[in-house]
UniProtKB/Swiss-Prot annotation:
Its cofactor is heme. A cytochrome P450 monooxygenase that selectively catalyzes the epoxidation of 14,15 double bond of (5Z,8Z,11Z,14Z)-eicosatetraenoic acid (arachidonate) forming 14,15-epoxyeicosatrienoic acid (14,15-EET) regioisomer. Mechanistically, uses molecular oxygen inserting one oxygen atom into a substrate, and reducing the second into a water molecule, with two electrons provided by NADPH via cytochrome P450 reductase (CPR; NADPH--hemoprotein reductase). One of its GO terms (cellular component) is endoplasmic reticulum membrane. This is Cytochrome P450 2C29. The modification N6-acetyllysine is found at residues 249, 252, 375. One of its GO terms (biological process) is arachidonate metabolic process. InterPro entries: Cyt_P450, Cyt_P450_CS, Cyt_P450_E_grp-I, Cyt_P450_E_grp-I_CYP2B-like, Cyt_P450_sf, Cytochrome_P450_fam2. It catalyses: an organic molecule + reduced [NADPH--hemoprotein reductase] + O2 = an alcohol + oxidized [NADPH--hemoprotein reductase] + H2O + H(+); (5Z,8Z,11Z,14Z)-eicosatetraenoate + reduced [NADPH--hemoprotein reductase] + O2 = 14,15-epoxy-(5Z,8Z,11Z)-eicosatrienoate + oxidized [NADPH--hemoprotein reductase] + H2O + H(+). Belongs to the cytochrome P450 family. Pfam families: p450. It comes from Mus musculus (Mouse). It is a peripheral membrane protein. The keyword Transmembrane helix does not apply.
Amino acid sequence: MDLVVFLALTLSCLILLSLWRQSSGRGKLPPGPTPLPIIGNFLQIDVKNISQSFTNFSKAYGPVFTLYLGSKPTVILHGYEAVKEALIDRGEEFAGRGSFPMAEKIIKGFGVVFSNGNRWKEMRRFTLMTLRNLGMGKRNIEDRVQEEAQCLVEELRKTKGSPCDPTFILSCAPCNVICSIIFQNRFDYKDKEFLILMDKINENVKILSSPWLQVCNSFPSLIDYCPGSHHKIVKNFNYLKSYLLEKIKEHKESLDVTNPRDFIDYYLIKQKQVNHIEQSEFSLENLASTINDLFGAGTETTSTTLRYALLLLLKYPDVTAKVQEEIDRVVGRHRSPCMQDRSHMPYTDAMIHEVQRFIDLLPTSLPHAVTCDIKFRKYLIPKGTTVITSLSSVLHDSKEFPNPEMFDPGHFLNGNGNFKKSDYFMPFSTGKRICAGEGLARMELFLILTTILQNFKLKSLVHPKEIDITPVMNGFASLPPPYQLCFIPL
């Protein structure tokens, strides 16, 4: 009996403590629904369609509101004005990376995506500079993407026009582009080492994006004590880390500081230059984690966008016909598309932008955090508070994009048929934490899609009206439903 009383008292104290901690901060933070003890507002959120839940809350509490995902407050920014004010106008104050316990457990704050403070600044600066040195925005990386696009075309020809699921083959191309930047060499699509590498990367991205991981991130104690797919992430990451450290070792043995070949070489040279500095951020641990970030952010997201783009082109054959007419007129059939062509292909450029806007791949992006105590609008947000931005609310803003739920390249064309930029276009997020590989991803999407459409007619297995383009929401990303198509050589 004494044990029962003790447990009851303990539980009551925990609940009262939770209620006190939540109520003590609510006078300063933006408004929001009343949280339950311990679990917060978790039961009020649809983990498979978080962005819709945010839209519903914004109607009740305005564009800046607070949710408790577990016992900690999270500030939500909904709509273009709130997102712009935070991430662009006050970018430095919102440049922290918000809480992501599962990533913190396996990556331990290394790399560029989940790091903070000086480490993040150093790794991001180095990554951007190295991508430029390797030819980002120049011919060097463009040549690699063009080569990969042609290899992809050859693989698609092997299907001989028969029905196929494009998931695997569209994953190979972006992964190989990253491999060529990191290791200097690409792999054959059937190479065993390449297949294992791709499988581990893709599996980790899928698990990290799953609803179960959103639960684990809200209740970190589950990570160590509950069975589940999250344990597979640790095993996969350890495999990838071991693989990358072996590659780094090979690079060390053949390094020529006067002639860097790839990302690893540039990092090792930088490491030599700063090895006299105490607490230098350029450790092998940081290198392995940064490479892992480049693979994770640069393969699955691009391949999913490509896969969704082909589905939309099947659904809207009139759009496909206009794009292919533009390719025939500007590029022809006797050379590969190049980035210089894009400025002469406004409809194709608009189509690719519309794909990214429409699919809304990462509805809430990765969490931010405020780097100091700040006053935002009329609210006080304490240092370290996690901030989530609803990119969906920006990309699907009906004032900027009339009929936002419709796929229409006209959203990015003016009355003269010329390409029209939009400040609301932020599929890569915006501000200080905008995706470091944005330029590479845009290049891949343009060159790979135009090369495919230059060489093939896309044939659906069903009538376009029967094609389902409804996204499969998995909690973090919007994925296309499974489908098959035929690539008919032109």
